[in-house]
Amino acid sequence: MLTTPQHYAYIKIAEGCNNFCAFCIIPHLRGRYRSRAVEDILQEARGLAESGVKELIVVAQDTSRYGTDLYGAPRLPLLLHELCRIEGFHWIRVHYLYPDMITDELLDTFASEPKLVNYMDIPIQHVNDAILRRMNRRGTRAELDEMLQKLRSRLPDAVIRTSLITGLPGEGEAEFEELCAWLRENKLERVGAFVFSPEDGTPAAKMEHADEEVAQRRAEIIAELQSRIMDEYNAARVGTVMEVLCEGEEPETGRCFGRTYADSPDIDGRVLFSAARSVSPGEFVMVRITGAEDGDLVGEMEENA
């Protein structure tokens, strides 16, 4: 049963997690990673398309690991190609791609499939190598930087979302400043800042970590930095024409609102736009961006859209 507006829906392709990050309880609660069979996923997806879903959002604790347990190797590219063949979907969005599993094959898949939106949700958490090792995160900062450079080169219009955690065990002022400097350099388009919260039963809960007040202040600094980065991103959109998925109308202003490919439901921004005709939720229209307002884009629907 759909629990989202009819024009978009989530499809879970796997359950559980094998990553065992030191701060996360999920593998202990949900068990080992278990992929669904390709045909099982496709059957559900076809039903969603037939019901009128226009945007399919692919999720799992780690979508990039899909298929490793069932087929002996990652099969996310294959699955995405098959999903793109289903008639009815206009956008297919993928969440939770782990940095070390973003391969050339996966990037080629995004580049070659028009339905796949270039929105990369990549849980990074931190970039200091010592903290990454302590938190049992795979990969290093150098490997992350190399992957991001390749991603930006292969998908120039990619929007990258991530979450960063402040106050992790081992994070002092130097490690925090390294994180800030990295964010200023890489200018990720979408970032959520969270304060480390020890989870009972995890290794990190037993480790010494930053004072909660200090961690909260650091999260606020990250949020302020990201706000400036997002303002730059929005300013660069002014004057362009973007495809927008309409989601409704503001009763108080009469303006329509919707999302671009750069915005996932509930967690990212919106586009507020005026329209000379009635626009239905779930309809795709072209909008000329004229400005920004409190983090959201503002525009006017193209008359021939």
Features from the language model and the residues they span:
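Proteins enriched for Cys/Gly/acidic motifs involved in redox and nucleic-acid/cofactor modification
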Residues: M1-Y66, E105, L116, M120, ...
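Short flexible coil/turn linkers enriched for glycine and charged/polar residues
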Residues: T3-H7, C17-N19, L116, H126, ...
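Conserved, mostly hydrophobic/aromatic
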Residues: C21, I41, V58, V94, ...
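Conserved SAM/AdoMet-binding glycine-rich loop
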Residues: E50-A174, R184
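Short acidic/polar active-site loop segments enriched in Thr and Asp
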Residues: K54, H90, E189, E283, ...
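Terminal RNA-binding accessory module
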Residues: P198, K206-A305
